[in-house]
Amino acid sequence: MKLSVRGEYALRALLVLARDYQEDDSVVRIQEVSERQNIPKRFLEQILNDLKSAGIVESKRGVAGGYRLRRPPERVTLADIIRHIEGPLAPVSCVSEKFYEKCSCPDESRCAIRSVMKETRDAIVAIMDRVTLAELCDRARRLEQEPLSASDFVI
């Protein structure tokens, strides 16, 4: 699995929506998401429309319009998001559980490469299925509290 720019932007946009999530119908304006995460607005609109069609976000039209998570952040996993934006989590399609395609090896059941790729897939899936947007928000808050190290400074 390689996270594309589109996938990264989707996660960053959803992080904003998760941090601002409330049980009421309040929304976050797309311009605000764009500015807070430095994402081009046109590209962000496409990503959010895609996430809307997946049922991850919902929108409200009009002057007071914007986007919000459709479910609480505790109920949206990184796997939900990445599978929709990027496709399979598996590094090769012959080990994908949701997007399986036969590979060209003579015997899949005895392929050493496939065996390692399956272990890789299992590790990725275990993490992505466990981490929710709520946990991502918690991590972001903790990281924001940490002092910058000398290697974080750029001259």
Predicted region positions:
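Beta-hairpin "wing" of winged helix-turn-helix
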Residues: 55-70
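Key DNA-contact positions within bacterial/archaeal DNA-binding proteins
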Residues: 42
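Short alpha-helical segments that sit at the start of domains
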Residues: 1-14
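Conserved segment of winged-helix/HTH DNA-binding domains
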Residues: 73-98, 113-122
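A short alpha-helical element within helix-turn-helix/winged-helix DNA-binding domains
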Residues: 28-38
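C-terminal regulatory/oligomerization modules of transcriptional regulators
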Residues: 96-155
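Basic amphipathic alpha-helical segments that dock to polyanions
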Residues: 17, 47-52
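Short amphipathic alpha-helical elements of helix-turn-helix/winged-helix folds
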Residues: 13-20, 84
